Regions:
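Amphipathic alpha-helical polymerization modules
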Residues: 1-246
């Protein structure tokens, strides 16, 4: 009986974790470059089937509890929107923009850049956007509207090339660890390579999820939690009957 009780309780715990991920995804729907978080629940229906088929609700000798796979990020391409803003750029294809973090390079899909008071190309958080030779500096007197960014990441101020965006790709994105809503750090075993992604000026890649997708997930999570709650109640009732409390 106890394994069945444990199974239903852990199933509820897993659905709570999935709910947290969906809530985070919904909170970041408007965040450029945000990558959707996913927690998969392993074999939920398989785990509950013995409870549903049991005549007394406690035939659970083979149940060990629902399990959740580790949270992971979905790095699929998000929708690209036109902004007509010169320093908004999006990547079409695999890869990341490289920016300077406090402890080394960080990687992002968000290309919402601007110039700081010193004329340095920076992110919304004020981190320097890295080029092939370091930060990208726009000459004095050049405005944002005069900056051109080519498809290969070359950055021009008028007719003068002032840098080229450092674009990075990883063979396995699972080596990346989130350090912010749209920033990632690479592990020591990560091997960065060049990418052939196309840079699109005047556009932004948005979060790679939608309110419809996440609301559908919420409905599914709610149904799974209700099923686990019913199983838990059935087991608890049977236990109480068998020990003479009812």
């Amino acid at each position: 009986m106890i394994p069945g009780l444990y199974s239903a309780a852990t199933a509820m715990d897993v659905t709570d974790r999935r709910h947290e991920m969906v809530a985070e995804n919904l909170a970041n729907l408007q965040m450029p470059g945000y990558r959707r978080r996913i927690v998969s629940q392993s074999n939920f229906d398989t785990l509950l089937r013995p409870l549903r088929q049991s005549t007394d609700g406690v035939d659970s000798s083979k149940l060990l509890g629902a399990t959740a796979d580790p949270a992971r990020y979905d790095f699929s391409q998000g929708n690209i929107q036109d902004t007509k803003r010169q320093l908004d750029v999006a990547l079409n294809g695999d890869g990341f923009f490289t920016v300077q973090g406090s402890s080394g390079p960080l990687y992002t899909r968000s290309g919402a850049f601007h110039l700081d008071p010193q004329g340095t190309l920076v992110t919304q958080d004020g981190l320097s956007v890295l080029g092939q030779g370091g930060s990208i500096q726009v000459p004095g007197g050049v405005t944002e509207s005069q900056v051109e960014i080519a498809a290969d990441g070359s950055v021009f101020a008028g007719d003068q090339q002032i840098g080229q965006l450092a674009l990075t790709r990883f063979a396995d994105n699972s080596v990346l660890t989130a350090v912010g809503a749209s920033l990632f750090a690479a592990g020591s075993n990560a091997v960065p390579t060049a990418t052939s992604a196309e840079v699109l000026q005047g556009r932004l890649e948005m979060a790679n999820t939608s309110s419809v997708t996440e609301l559908i997930n919420l409905i599914s999570i709610s149904r799974h939690r209700d099923a686990a709650q019913k199983a838990l109640n059935a087991i608890a009732d049977t236990i109480q009957k068998r020990i003479g409390l009812r």
